[in-house]
Amino acid sequence: MKDILTAPFVKEMCDTTANMYRLGWDERNGGNISYLLDENEVAEYLDLNNVIRTIPTGFDAPELIGKIFIVTGTGKYFKNVKNDPENNLGIIRIAKDGTTAELLWGYADGGKFTSELPAHLMSHRARLKVDPENRVVMHSHPTNTLAMNYVHELDEKKLTHTLWEMCTECIVVFPDGVGVLPWMLCGTNEIGEATAEKMKEFRLVIWGMHGIYGAGKTMDETFGLIETVEKAAQIYMLTCNMPRVNTIKDSEMQQLAEYFGVNYRKDFLNL
């Protein structure tokens, strides 16, 4: 059996968490990632019959029974993941009862998955119905995206439109726009359910005055979605107090979307 620490999915988690910490998106123990894995690939590294312990998930997910995820741990600092993955990450499988996680590897210090696991699993469930290839759900606190929450209306159309205006690539990268939730208590099933509802329509969901959720087929795609929003938010924050001389017109955004063949939110443009 291969060494689990050499598995591509473990390396991806280590590299991505380190990068997110480096960028200042995930201070202290902020942020979390869950990654849906292929059972056959995991079996190359772990005995799938060896369940270390079971942990209640806090909600029922019958659609995800048997699914295997690698998930960041609760209270864990992203800066420590790369040097100590076995304590900071865990590989779990949703048990047959749909409400329990079977720990197959990790959380070696007795810890468990992120407190936001309900929001992650509910989002996976929602995105898989829209896109069966969805694999990653990522939550972080990008500085400029969060700052923008305090000075811009938290309206999906208006916020998306502003972000699209900031960089030529934005309407191409996230043509489906950005969903928005008001401030809600984190770590609860309620915010998980609200996020999952938005995930039926958007791959990106702003948690008001808190951070952002992203979902995608790969780690790179998901990271890139959040990265692009953060760049747009940075440009907005750098320019919002200055006179606007130039902008990308709605007709030009439409040109971009149609040239690159993306399915964009036409109702978010003022044409």
Regions found by a protein language model. Name each.
Residues M1-L271:
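Glycine-rich flexible loops
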